[in-house]
């Protein structure tokens, strides 16, 4: 709405037209909205262990007690295991609204596992947001497929090669 005001169900608002369009896309996403993480849950599934670079961010640690973020995982999952885990969590956490693939390697480089996971989750929970985190090197090869899967949140990490 030109010159208008957009607001969320939890009281935040924006006034700029461009910001309003962006806000509409991120307001319910717990990774991108300061307030959304109080109302919506997200889950990362570690289905993509292969990577095309070795950076300091995704060091592919397992069971690191002090870290809980994309790139660090307790266990690698197959796409089928990830789907079962997502369905189990969704049955107990109704606020679950976002599923992301962010490693522990690169989600675009390990594409077959990432795509199979997204396809399974989207088939079972069609209204869930799908997200991906990638170093971007293999992203151009999969942009059309990501769009076809309605993956509308892509995080591109900017890291330094060791």
UniProtKB/Swiss-Prot annotation:
Keywords: 4Fe-4S, Iron, Iron-sulfur, Lyase, Metal-binding, Nitrogen fixation, Plasmid, S-adenosyl-L-methionine
Top-level taxon of the source organism: Bacteria
Enzyme Commission number(s): 4.-.-.-
Cofactor: binding details: Binds 3 [4Fe-4S] clusters per monomer. One cluster is coordinated with 3 cysteines and an exchangeable S-adenosyl-L-methionine. The two others probably act as substrate.
Organism: Rhizobium leguminosarum
Protein family (similarity comment): Belongs to the radical SAM superfamily. NifB family.
Annotated PROSITE patterns: MOAA_NIFB_PQQE (PS01305), RADICAL_SAM (PS51918)
GO biological process terms on file: nitrogen fixation
Name by which UniProt lists this protein: FeMo cofactor biosynthesis protein NifB
Pathways involved: Cofactor biosynthesis; Fe-Mo cofactor biosynthesis
Positions bound to S-adenosyl-L-methionine: 57, 105, 157
MF terms (GO), sorted A to Z: 4 iron, 4 sulfur cluster binding; lyase activity; metal ion binding
């Amino acid at each position: 709405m030109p010159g208008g005001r957009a607001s969320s169900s939890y009281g935040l608002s924006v006034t700029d037209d461009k910001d309003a369009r962006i806000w509409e896309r991120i307001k319910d996403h717990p990774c991108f909205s300061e307030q959304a993480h109080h109302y919506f849950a997200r889950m990362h599934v570690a289905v993509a262990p292969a990577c095309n670079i070795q950076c300091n961010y995704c060091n592919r640690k397992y069971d690191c007690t002090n870290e809980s973020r994309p790139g660090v995982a307790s266990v690698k999952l197959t796409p089928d295991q990830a789907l079962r885990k997502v369905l189990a969590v969704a049955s107990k956490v109704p606020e679950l609204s976002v599923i992301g693939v962010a490693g522990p390697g690169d989600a675009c480089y390990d594409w077959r596992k990432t795509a199979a996971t997204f396809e399974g989750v989207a088939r079972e929970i069609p209204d869930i947001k799908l997200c991906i985190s990638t170093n971007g090197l293999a992203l151009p090869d999969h942009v059309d497929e990501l769009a076809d899967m309605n993956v509308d949140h892509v995080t591109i990490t900017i890291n330094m090669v060791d």
